[in-house]
From Swiss-Prot:
Superkingdom as given in the UniProt entry: Bacteria
Source species of the chain: Cereibacter sphaeroides (strain ATCC 17025 / ATH 2.4.3) (Rhodobacter sphaeroides)
Keyword list, A-Z: Glycolysis, Isomerase, Manganese, Metal-binding
Subunit structure: Monomer.
Residues binding Mn(2+) 2: 13, 63, 437-438
Record Pfam families: iPGM_N, Metalloenzyme
Pathways per UniProt: Carbohydrate degradation; glycolysis; pyruvate from D-glyceraldehyde 3-phosphate: step 3/5
GO molecular-function terms, A-Z: manganese ion binding; phosphoglycerate mutase activity
Protein name: 2,3-bisphosphoglycerate-independent phosphoglycerate mutase
């Protein structure tokens, strides 16, 4: 048969499946298009967590992991598991980049500043990585100051007190906590530089709220009505800021939410906001690569692996045209992560980024920029592209707020866009796969605490085939199977590096 054109991959970010309707935004929302597709089109479910996406068993997936696996067409071993194993086996302490960092700081008589996520969420960082790094550096005789980034998003919203207590009790002699900062301030990815400045002012200059210790900082924030994600940058004890000769080590192993704060702390020529005088760092280390720009002023403990013949690269190598579209919050995922960590577009790859709305939290505007995404998606479907990849951010980003009604509104807005896309694909004679990278908004109440659930889930996600071959069925699978499925629809062979299997069964 003639290959359909275009073939569209529509990713409903954070749209999981759960049988129970209670606090299930996906089930409770009015989504006539999604419901019709599930009732009339071939569909199945995908696994998005644990070893099926290269993570430790039981570890929930996330957008970076999901899009990396989708684009690779194979299970990609993720940094969380690799770092866990290095710590367990003792090779972390001998990591060449870490040893070089310690030597440089020691030679200058400086202090090592460690910034990391203080939770066991495992999406951007992990408290055990932070503790392990403190132990290694302190054992070398270098003083350590920790910049504790509280989570409340990939874990329960008010769990930071316990994690901070755990960290404080694990600290060896010569190590202390210098600041406590909610990730809202320190881990922005949408150029909200007013937030980032507040975080860097605390780390660089000791400016912000004050507290005697880290546990007291969390308690004071809660008394101010701030849950963990939003804890105002707080300076602990006698901490006064960073000095010339100090070193800085960022322990985040996911790039997107580390880039801005690191640029503010050390990027030469940085001018997005007034940083004040920055120290002459003796060493500036990252757990992973954050971008080619960051590589110019940072060293890396665990450089990224090269993923050859991703979906985008393979499609480009056959002289075909492709289009990527998302709003700001998920734009890196349909470009950088889907392309295996490559910044530069492939030949014939066009992109569009809709600007995410400038609101404090997305429950205030649950439609986000989905209408703009939908407009450009429908336009692209009619423009002769061979492959289109689109991400709707709403179910995930609004799901993270814990607001059920807003999450329902988010799903309804996405469903409207999905309806427009389905009709455009039908008119163009194309085909579409509708799926998600992980779950989120299908669970809005924590079953253990009864409070808001703001994290991702390990629930299965849907995969639906629209406009596929007559009589086709879909089997259950995992995210790595999506690229081979798209290639089959496009009539392209599968590169040998892709070990995923097409989900289409005749």
């Amino acid at each position: 048969m003639t290959a359909p054109k275009p073939v569209v991959l529509c990713i409903l970010d954070g749209w999981g499946l759960r049988a129970e309707r209670e606090a299930n935004a996906v089930a409770l929302a009015n989504t006539p298009t999604f419901d019709r597709l599930m009732a009339t089109c071939p569909n199945a479910t995908l696994i998005t967590h644990g070893p099926d996406v290269g993570l430790p068993r039981g570890q929930m997936g996330n957008s970076e992991v999901g899009h990396t696996n989708i684009g690779a067409g194979r299970v990609v071993a993720m940094d969380l598991g690799a770092i866990d194993l290095a710590i367990e086996e003792g090779t972390f302490a001998r990591n060449p980049a870490l040893c070089d960092f310690i030597a440089k700081v020691k030679a200058k008589g400086g202090t090592a500043h460690l910034m990391g996520v203080v939770s066991d969420g495992g999406v951007h960082g992990h408290i055990q990585h932070l503790i392990a790094a403190v132990e290694v550096i302190a054992a070398s005789g270098v003083p350590v100051v920790i910049h504790a980034i509280t989570d409340g998003r990939d874990v329960a919203p008010t769990s930071a007190g316990g994690f901070v207590q755990q960290l404080a009790e694990a600290l060896p002699a010569g190590a202390s906590i210098g600041t406590v900062i909610g990730r809202y301030w320190a881990m922005d990815r949408d150029k909200r530089w007013d937030r980032v400045k507040r975080a860097s002012d605390a780390m660089l200059h000791g400016q912000g709220e004050r507290a005697a210790d880290a546990v007291a900082a969390v308690a004071a924030a809660l008394a101010r009505g701030e849950t963990d994600e939003f804890i105002a940058p707080t300076v602990i004890g006698s901490y006064t800021g960073a000095m010339d000769g100090d070193g800085f080590f960022c322990l985040n192993f996911r790039a997107d939410r580390a880039r801005e704060i690191l640029a503010g702390l050390a990027q030469p020529g940085f001018d997005a906001y007034d940083t004040g005088r920055r120290p002459d760092w003796s060493g500036f280390l990252g757990m992973v690569d954050y971008s080619t720009e960051h590589d110019r002023f940072m060293t890396t403990a665990y450089p990224k692996q090269v993923i050859r013949n991703t979906l985008g690269e393979w499609v480009a190598s056959h002289g075909l045209r492709q289009f990527r579209i998302a709003e700001t919050e998920k734009y890196p995922h349909v470009t950088f992560f889907l392309n295996g960590g490559k910044e530069v577009p492939e030949a014939g790859e066009d992109r569009y980024m809709a600007n995410s709305p400038k609101v404090a939290t997305y429950d205030l505007k649950p439609e986000m920029s989905a209408p703009d995404v939908s407009d450009h998606l429908v336009q692209a479907i009619g423009e002769g592209y061979d492959l289109i990849v689109v991400n709707y951010a709403n179910p995930d980003m609004v799901g993270h707020t814990g607001d059920l009604r807003a999450a329902m509104a988010a799903c309804e807005e996405v469903d409207r866009g999905l309806g427009r896309a389905v009709e455009a694909v039908r008119q163009a004679g194309g085909a579409m796969i509708v799926t998600a990278d992980h779950g989120n908004c299908e669970t809005m109440i924590d079953p253990e605490t009864g409070g808001p659930h703001t994290a991702h889930t390990t629930n299965p996600v849907p995969v639906i085939l629209v406009g596929g071959p007559a009589g086709a069925r879909l089997r259950a699978g995992r995210l790595a199977d999506l690229a081979p499925t798209l290639l089959e629809l496009m009539g392209l062979p599968q590169p040998e590096e892709m070990t995923g299997r097409s989900l289409i069964e005749a």
